[in-house]
């Protein structure tokens, strides 16, 4: 089979397609390699929710769990060994893509319980980088207030970073500043900037879910349903274009520094009244990443409506959407604060589920 034509058109428009899922079954069965060859997938993202699901219902981990139990590994250590092995093997599958260009990246998240602890986030990120030991790893760090300085410090050590849980353009600007500061420090530390990569994971569908819910109690709110998330992402892209055209970045680019690409995350559609490819179709733009759950990937392969760049030059109309939301009484600052808090809480809960699953598996294996 040749690469799907819809997904090829998406790639040609400058969108790198990453899969927002990973499991040992997907690796061992050859499915991941098949998605690379047939569905234009050039990277993978994982998160605690994905790993909790993978480990809870697959026999593929049994042998390693038995080995871990036999040597008395702690639950925390077992979780790390199980997840880093999957990430390492996925990184090897993507190695050729990585060596050919700027994709082939595989992302692994720091323990989400550290989201508000700068020092421990830095330590964990550096430990993960050493444990996986693959140049195409990206360590995921949340864009919390405490995460921002951690992002800079980890980049300064030459480590590639996927910044996650970004909801507002204001916080995204902080993230880009943290990235540039990290590159500046990495250069001062003697690192090759060309070897450092970063993406900024801007969450999409959750914004519509939260704002649409609030619009239900607003007179005339139906007019604004389903507009916020795409407008938000388009405003973020305008900020990206501005920052990476700046003299500050140009000085880093002259030393091999790369732009921190926007990555559209949370692109699975939650509302069944919307097209299941809307967060793909409407967010096509050069030098972006769209990380898709498998259902969104297959839907896009089947019926994505790829019409070229749908993002550039749309900041003014997107700002009008936000002005209308504010005029309707939607407290956008509160929306983004709630989404960040819920995002961290969701990943913490998944992490606890992951720990509990592995704890039970270790006990059964003894």
UniProtKB/Swiss-Prot annotation:
EC category name: transferase
GO molecular function (one): transaldolase activity
Gene Ontology biological-process entries: carbohydrate metabolic process; pentose-phosphate shunt
Keyword Transferase: yes
Pathway entry: Carbohydrate degradation; pentose phosphate pathway; D-glyceraldehyde 3-phosphate and beta-D-fructose 6-phosphate from D-ribose 5-phosphate and D-xylulose 5-phosphate (non-oxidative stage): step 2/3
InterPro entries documented for this protein: Aldolase_TIM, TAL/FSA, Transaldolase_2, Transaldolase_AS
Domain of life: Bacteria
Record's subcellular location: Cytoplasm
Keywords: Cytoplasm, Pentose shunt, Schiff base, Transferase
GO cellular component: cytoplasm
Pfam families in the record: TAL_FSA
Catalysed reaction equations from the record: D-sedoheptulose 7-phosphate + D-glyceraldehyde 3-phosphate = D-erythrose 4-phosphate + beta-D-fructose 6-phosphate
Active site, UniProt feature: 140
Keyword Transcription applies: no
EC numbers, comma separated: 2.2.1.2
Function in brief: Transaldolase is important for the balance of metabolites in the pentose-phosphate pathway.
Family: Belongs to the transaldolase family. Type 2 subfamily.
The protein's name: Transaldolase
Organism whose genome encodes this protein: Saccharopolyspora erythraea (strain ATCC 11635 / DSM 40517 / JCM 4748 / NBRC 13426 / NCIMB 8594 / NRRL 2338)
């Amino acid at each position: 089979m040749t690469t799907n034509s819809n997904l090829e058109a998406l790639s040609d428009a400058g969108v790198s397609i990453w899969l927002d899922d990973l499991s040992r079954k997907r690796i061992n069965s050859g499915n991941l390699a098949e998605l690379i060859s047939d569905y234009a997938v050039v990277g993978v993202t994982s998160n605690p929710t994905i790993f909790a699901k993978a480990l809870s219902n697959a026999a593929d981990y049994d042998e390693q769990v038995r080995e871990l139990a036999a040597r008395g590994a702690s639950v925390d250590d077992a979780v790390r060994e199980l997840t880093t092995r999957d990430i390492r093997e996925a990184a090897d599958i993507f190695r050729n893509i990585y060596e050919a260009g700027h994709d082939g990246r595989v992302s692994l998240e720091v323990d989400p319980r550290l989201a508000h602890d700068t020092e421990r986030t830095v330590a964990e990120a550096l430990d993960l980088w050493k444990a996986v030991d693959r140049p195409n790893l990206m360590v995921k760090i949340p864009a919390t207030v405490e995460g921002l300085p951690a992002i800079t410090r980890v980049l300064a050590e030459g480590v590639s970073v996927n910044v996650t849980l970004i909801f507002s353009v204001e916080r995204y600007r902080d993230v880009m500043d943290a990235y540039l500061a990290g590159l500046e420090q990495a250069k001062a530390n003697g690192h090759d900037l060309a070897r450092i990569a970063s993406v900024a994971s801007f969450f999409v569908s959750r914004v519509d879910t939260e704002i649409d819910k609030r619009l239900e109690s607003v007179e005339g709110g139906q007019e604004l349903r389903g507009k916020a998330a795409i407008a938000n992402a388009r405003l973020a892209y305008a900020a990206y274009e501005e920052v990476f055209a700046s003299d500050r970045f140009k000085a880093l680019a002259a030393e091999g520094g790369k732009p921190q690409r926007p990555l559209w995350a949370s692109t699975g559609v939650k509302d069944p009244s919307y097209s299941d490819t809307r967060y793909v179709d409407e967010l096509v733009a050069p030098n972006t990443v769209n990380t898709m759950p498998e259902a969104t990937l297959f839907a896009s392969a089947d019926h994505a409506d790829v019409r070229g760049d749908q993002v550039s030059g749309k900041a003014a109309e997107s700002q009008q959407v936000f002005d209308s939301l504010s005029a309707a009484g939607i407290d956008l600052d509160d929306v983004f604060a709630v989404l960040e808090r819920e995002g961290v809480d969701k990943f913490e809960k998944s992490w606890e589920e992951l720990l509990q699953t592995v704890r039970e598996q270790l006990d059964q294996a003894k």
